[in-house]
Swiss-Prot record:
It catalyses: L-histidinol + 2 NAD(+) + H2O = L-histidine + 2 NADH + 3 H(+). InterPro entries: Ald_DH/histidinol_DH, Histidinol_DH_CS, Histidinol_DH_monofunct, Hstdl_DH. Gene3D superfamilies: 1.20.5.1300, Nitrogenase molybdenum iron protein domain (3.40.50.1980). Its EC number is 1.1.1.23. Disulfide bonds: none annotated. This is Histidinol dehydrogenase. It comes from the Bacteria. It is an enzyme of class 1 (oxidoreductase).
Length: 433
């Protein structure tokens, strides 16, 4: 336990310091080699890498449409219900975010518009691993579907002789995704960035991944004209603010649900009760012993802090300084504090709002800024799948009046041609009279 007010500023900073995350020069070099190979060789490069990295004897790239359509037959009723519910809730929440164009007159004869346009082609990356991640498909695929993007490509790795898990295929089917690519890592990112014989080129790439995926996304965003990515990625994290009436078992469960993500995850508790912190420590020990990913969670807890603060108000100040990906509020009454929330990716209010709900099915998005980026980045939302452009229409009388602002500014900035583009029109208007 760390007593916040008794610690030096250096110790306080250390308690909020995240595990170092830095891509090695080796990772960057490998990614550059992979990107170049895919750019030059297309599908052949992807198939070669599937054999080399994924141990696939007879790899393929595109998943046939009939496999996607038949996927639900392989699901249990329980899992199908879960995916259907998550899809419906995420769609409901994000559908309300559909943007509306703006059109107004800034002054007589001057009309300005803001128009929203779906990004035409988007790529979604879904990591592989020991278990399928249909929730990752839903959190990104629903938004692509609602935006009306013309092309949506989903890439996910396949190991050995396995096929893409039917839960992934079914989630993709619900989201209207028909272009599924059996490819992972930096190669998949390169394929979506450059395009190959089987993989359409996209304009923006979404989705988490390992250090190779993260580096590849950064590289294509820097080198491929017009390419964008969603947001910087980092280890998962949660910060819990709790008071003296909070449930220590609930707190421990929430902390461990993040700690099990990875050894580089970080969890922090800010509480004004020494007794609750001590009980939480005991609950962590009990619950940790039952976890299948106990070793991973233990390593994450080594990077974590249980902090005693003087007041809940102070806890919010410390939280704002940290900028958590997930912020959980276990307070007798959170209402007075909601406006004090700063720099948090997503907030979970009350004893019965576990972070797991947002990860899967409440309706909010689980793609969130980590590593302190919540101070400047937002959770993934529908606007991330749109671009905007502006329109202005000016009448003769409108330009005549507006020229009184344009000409002095153009002259002050020494841009004669700018001024002339207005003056020549004013002269034409004068000659018409």
């Amino acid at each position: 336990m760390l007593r916040w007010n008794e610690e030096s500023s250096q110790a306080q900073a250390a308690a909020l310091t995240r595990p170092a995350v830095s891509a090695s020069a080796k990772v960057e070099a490998i990614c550059k080699t992979i990107l170049a190979k895919v750019k030059e060789q297309g599908d052949d490069a992807l198939l070669d890498m599937a054999k080399e990295f994924d141990n696939r004897a007879n790899p393929r790239l595109r998943v046939p449409l009939d496999e996607i359509n038949a996927s639900e037959q392989a699901l249990s009723a329980e899992l199908k219900y879960a995916i259907d519910t998550a899809y419906a809730n995420v769609k409901c929440f994000h559908e309300a975010q559909l943007p509306k164009d703006i059109k107004l007159s800034t002054q007589p004869g001057v009309v300005c518009e803001l128009k929203y346009q779906a990004i035409e082609a988007v790529g979604i990356y879904v990591p592989g691993g020991s278990a399928p991640l249909p929730s990752s498909v839903i959190m990104q695929g629903v938004l692509a579907q609602l935006s009306g993007a013309k092309t949506v490509v989903l890439a996910t790795p396949v190991q050995g002789d396995k096929a893409i898990n039917p839960a992934i295929l079914y989630a993709a089917k619900l989201c209207g995704i028909t272009t599924l690519i059996e490819s992972g890592g930096a190669g998949a990112i390169a394929a979506m960035a450059y395009g190959t014989e089987s993989v359409p080129k996209v304009n923006k790439i979404f989705g988490p991944g390992n250090s190779f995926v993260t580096m590849a996304k950064q590289l294509v965003a820097q080198t491929v004209p017009g390419m964008a990515i969603d947001m910087p990625a980092g280890p998962s994290e949660v910060l819990v603010i709790a008071d003296e009436r909070a449930n220590p078992e609930f707190i421990a469960a929430d902390l461990l649900s993040q700690a099990e993500h990875g050894a580089d995850s970080q969890v922090i508790l800010l509480c004004n009760s020494e007794s609750i912190i001590e009980q939480t420590q005991q609950a962590l020990t009990r619950q940790l012993a039952k976890l299948s990913r106990k070793e991973t969670a233990e390593q994450a807890l080594a990077n974590s802090s249980l902090i005693l603060v003087d007041s809940i108000a102070q806890a919010f100040d410390v939280s704002a300084q940290y900028g958590p990906e997930h912020l959980i509020l276990q307070l007798a009454d959170s209402t007075p504090y909601l406006d004090k929330v700063k720099n948090a990716g997503s907030v979970f209010v009350g004893d019965y709002t576990p972070e797991s709900a947002g990860d899967y099915a409440s309706g909010t998005n689980h793609v969130l800024p980590t590593y302190g980026y919540s101070a400047s980045y937002s959770s993934l939302n529908l606007l991330d799948f749109f671009r905007t452009y502006t329109v202005q229409t000016i009448t003769k009388s409108g330009l005549t009046q507006l020229s009184k602002a344009i000409l002095p500014l153009a002259n002050a900035e020494g841009l004669d041609a700018h001024a002339n583009a207005v003056s020549i029109r004013l002269e034409a208007i004068k000659n018409e009279q």
